[in-house]
């Protein structure tokens, strides 16, 4: 991949968060940084069971990659605890060994929510590309609203009772976007789209 070229020349140490690796749609497979030539010399990759297996709060996952970095992490962790609660470890092992059908079910659920949201926004005149992975949808604010992300997010919350994340919270280049989380079922998503259409169908605020 083009993004991987010269990885070792740019970063001497790299930590890759692969939390959403299993939440992929339409045949897409999320890449691992460890696929990149030379990455195992400088990188480690973290995976959590929180997203793929609906185990948030269990604090269970694993790290793989550069042996020296993992050794340092293991030493550091040993200063804080002596291992995870055994039943949680057993549950994690069971999920990894026998949880493929459950992961597929989770993916299908998020795909349905993604399609409902993106199709709804596009029918309202937005131009939203369906993401190939994760439980989030980034949508560019249509120019007709003449607003940046924070102001638009406030209006959605105050006038339509719909909560989104303003893109500016992720950096200056996100200020023309808002981020939706696919945490509600299809019916609630349709309700949110209807409320948004009713309350902000026309531009009402000047761009800041």
Regions found by a protein language model. Name each.
Residues 146-147, 155-165, 169-201:
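PLP-dependent enzyme catalytic core of the Aspartate aminotransferase-like
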Residues 93, 109-118, 128-141, 174:
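Conserved glycine-rich beta-strand-loop-beta hairpin in the small C-terminal domain of fold type I
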């Amino acid at each position: 991949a083009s993004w991987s070229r010269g990885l070792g020349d740019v970063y001497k140490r790299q930590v890759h968060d692969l939390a959403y690796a299993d939440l992929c749609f339409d045949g897409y497979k999320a890449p691992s940084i460890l696929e990149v030539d030379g990455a195992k010399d400088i990188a480690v990759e973290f995976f959590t069971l929180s997203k793929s297996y609906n185990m948030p709060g269990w604090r269970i996952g694993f790290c793989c990659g550069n042996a020296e970095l993992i050794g340092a992490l293991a030493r550091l962790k040993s200063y804080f605890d002596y291992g995870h609660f055994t039943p949680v470890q057993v549950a994690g092992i069971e999920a990894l060994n026998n949880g493929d059908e459950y992961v597929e079910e989770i993916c299908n659920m998020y795909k349905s929510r993604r399609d409902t949201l993106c199709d709804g926004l596009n029918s309202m005149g937005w131009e939203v590309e369906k993401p190939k992975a994760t439980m989030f949808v980034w949508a560019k604010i249509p120019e007709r609203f003449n607003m940046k992300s924070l102001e638009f997010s406030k209006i959605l919350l105050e006038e339509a009772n719909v909560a989104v994340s303003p893109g500016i919270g992720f950096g200056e280049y996100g200020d023309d976007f808002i981020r939706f989380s696919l945490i509600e079922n299809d019916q609630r998503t349709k309700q949110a789209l209807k409320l948004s259409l009713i309350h902000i169908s026309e531009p009402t605020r000047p761009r800041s």
